[in-house]
Amino acid sequence: MLNAQINFTAKDQVPDYNGKFRFGVNPGYHGSDWGDEDLADIAAGEAGVGAFRASLPEFFLEQWGYDVEIDDFQHYQSVGMEDHVAFIGYPTDEHQEETFYCPNHQSELFSNMYLDIWDGGANGTPVNDENHYALYVYRMVTTYQDYVRFWEVWNEPDFDYSGNGYKDAGQPGNWFDNVPEPCDMSIRAPIFAYIRMLRISYEVIKSIDPDAYVAIGGLGFPSFLDLVMRHSDNPDEGQITDVYPDNGGAYFDVMSYHAYPHIDGSLREWNNDIGDFDYFRHSDAATDGILQKQIDFRTVLYNYGYNDQLYPAKKWIITEANIPGIAFDDEMGSEEAQRNFLIKTRVGCELNNILQLDLFQLARKKLPEDANSGFDAMGLFHRLSDIEPSGEELTSQGIASQTMTALLSDATYDAAATTALNLPANIGGAAYENSDGTYTFILWAKTTTDQSESVAGNYSMPASMNMTDLEKREWNFSQTGNFNIVFANEISLTGAPVFLRGIPVAVDISEQPLLSHTLDIFPNPSPDNFQLSIKGTTTANFQIEVINVFGVLIEQRKIVHNGSRVIHNFDCSSWAKGAYFVKVRSAEGLVVLKVVVD
């Protein structure tokens, strides 16, 4: 069956995301003893990973067959991994553009991309089979649409050989005010050709799976994003014409970026007084660096109207990020900082609507004594290539990941409860509601000292949350099984995040029966509305209050009951998911009923 061409762009719509936050990882290659299924087994089963950032290059699929990875993706699904990212592109030699846009460097992109994308089914597919990239995307997405949620177009197309990508507007050679030469970028082709890839990707992918997400590929520089946003795919300087009607922002749903705070300038600032840098090499500054990059990219997107006002806002994923477990030169790096960074960054992602964080990487490439850069000291596992499956060993970051996933596996980030924590400036954290109605709080004292994770802080749960005792678990709980009880008004914190679990006692559940009346709530649980039934033969005045688990009043009513059975409807479609208490009071007493909104 031929797919219909689409009649919309990302200027018109971006699909809602109804999945949960996923902690993913870049799996990498670790020798012939480790197949993709083996890596998935240890990633999901031991490190708590929920998704892979996979790669499906054309040269690989053409050589081995387009369905070569189906068994692997089915296995990922069987171990609980879903909503994967796949970065795409990378043509076969036969399909690589032959143009040399600069001496000694052939274009890395596909040939024939400027042929028509569609041919009305002339060759049995809806796309023009002579447009090599369009045909590759069509065949790939048709095969893997049930497994891949985010299609990331290329990997780091903005990788910069010129030294200009990082520059701010106004500086010589910057990309905000200038168009880079093709060979300044890793694609070795004009920026307009990359936008052409985005357009082909968007049109073809959306024709097959309108709810799939097209992501701009793992960017590091806001200036490259600005290039895409201000040009079309027109090879004539990116001008807008009838044939090339939109700039690049129309052809992707998701802003995907990469961030490595230890090398991107996040952790230092020039000080004229000392003629040197001030450094901030600690985990909170590293997490702040990750989130500052989101702000920088968002500023560009908003400048071009992608702000949910003129056009739909983009969704967000991070497909590479980490800091080293070993310090090199003046860079940040320690085991303690690395594991703290992971937990803090996961929390930061959820606080800022980032849908997925794909850590770099599953396992370290070298032993500590052989490492010669920070990237050699990143991973949830120690080096795998020297050992066979079953001999793997988690790093401390991997243990923290295992603990984090175990304690949050059935939990959902709760923005309202996080706000209710009223955290002071020196305390970081968030609230998560567990499926049983209890809460897990991740809290820590914010680090402030260069090259130190040592800090102390105290926090007391607000009285309105009605917490008494909490179970406190540390980053290595998945290995030790240890926890202790702390008072909710005397919580001592350090720079290492802790997991605190407790149930708020928002109301006195003791019921004083209303002897003349029978009360019932249905349906319960309820997705969008529930009904309160009051049955009795006598006249009575009722005061009804609905409160959440923190005692916050959600709705109140006064009802005069004149006998018989009366049904009162409550619209809960706008309420946050979770448990609520319906307090029904009359002259005879109080009844408290629990209802769950799901």
Write out the residue ranges for each language-model feature.
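C-terminal beta-strand-rich structural cap/linker in extracellular carbohydrate-active enzymes
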Residues: G481-V507, G578
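C-terminal outer-membrane/trafficking sorting elements
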Residues: P513-D598
